[in-house]
């Protein structure tokens, strides 16, 4: 089942075309990566999918229904982390979480559980207005996942985080996905997308330039070559077919082979190849 979809969605801000006939679908239970550099329409797409913006043209569906039909019960199944997500500045981390938990009818024990997973368990008394950008981002994420949403929108969720904290957040997201949460993730971090996402879409100039499973995209755009690294440091290449590989290995009989692998690009290299632009 498609948990959300867009069909030929377009949106302009004045004379600027933000999205131009955008079409894609996300299956329930997957982590879907919406990838591209700043300014290509990733945040705009989330705002459309959460009804913060209305399209000029096209159809949007969430939970299998036109987005205009979503009621409060449907929105209670959604979690959002974005630049527009707010906190109560004069309240502590714990107080912000407690307020949200009370509104959702959640037990206080759930607060401690989530704060532990985002690395804020020892910072519950800190006032929100004094938080660093990274800590604020983790608080907003904690609030977004507190109620175990069916659908989670994450706009650059680890952009301000250090590697250790990023790894912890990735573990949390995998755990939630294993529990049934569908995650729509925007990022310009292709390594993050490769680690987390079942499928990805490359967004460029308001359109989908390419989409697919990361491993399959790497094979699709791989060089038709195989690289053999010998133990003495010498590197050799041959065509990627059984005959050429077999002939090369036969010629190397008696020499120590350290590795044999195809020359597959990473997602960042594929994005550059497909769109002609870098991610930064």
Which functions belong to the PLM regions below?
Residues 98, 102, 108-124:
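Conserved ABC ATPase "signature" region
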Residues 152-156:
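Catalytic Walker B motif of ABC-type/P-loop ATPase nucleotide-binding domains
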Residues 216-280:
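Short, charged/small-residue-rich alpha-helical element at the C-terminal edge
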Residues 211-212:
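ABC ATPase "signature
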Residues 58-69, 73-74:
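Conserved ABC transporter NBD signature motif
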């Amino acid at each position: 089942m498609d948990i959300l979809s867009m069909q030929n969605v377009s949106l302009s801000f004045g004379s600027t075309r933000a999205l131009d006939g955008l079409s894609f679908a996300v299956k329930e239970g997957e982590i879907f990566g919406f990838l591209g550099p700043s300014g290509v329409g990733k945040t705009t797409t989330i705002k459309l999918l959460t009804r913060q913006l209305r399209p000029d043209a096209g159809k949007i569906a969430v939970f299998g229904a036109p987005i205009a039909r979503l009621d409060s019960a449907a929105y209670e199944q959604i979690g959002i982390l974005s630049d527009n997500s707010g906190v109560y500045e004069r309240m502590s981390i714990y107080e912000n979480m407690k307020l949200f938990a009370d509104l959702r009818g959640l037990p206080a024990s759930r607060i401690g559980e989530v704060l532990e997973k985002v690395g804020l368990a020892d910072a519950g008394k800190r006032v929100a207005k004094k938080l660093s950008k990274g800590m604020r981002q983790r608080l907003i994420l904690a609030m977004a996942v507190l109620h175990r949403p069916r659908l989670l929108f994450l706009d650059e969720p680890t952009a301000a985080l250090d590697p250790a904290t990023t790894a912890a957040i990735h573990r949390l997201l995998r755990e939630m996905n294993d529990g049934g949460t569908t995650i729509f993730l925007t990022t310009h971090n292709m390594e993050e997308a490769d680690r987390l996402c079942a499928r990805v879409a490359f967004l460029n100039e308001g359109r989908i330039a390419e989409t697919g499973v990361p491993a399959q995209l790497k094979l699709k755009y791989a060089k038709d070559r195989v690289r053999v690294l010998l133990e003495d440091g010498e590197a050799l290449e041959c065509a990627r077919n059984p005959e050429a590989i077999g002939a090369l290995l036969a010629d190397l009989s008696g020499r120590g082979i350290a590795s044999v692998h195809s020359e597959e690009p990473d997602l960042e290299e594929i994005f550059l190849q497909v769109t002609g632009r870098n991610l930064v």
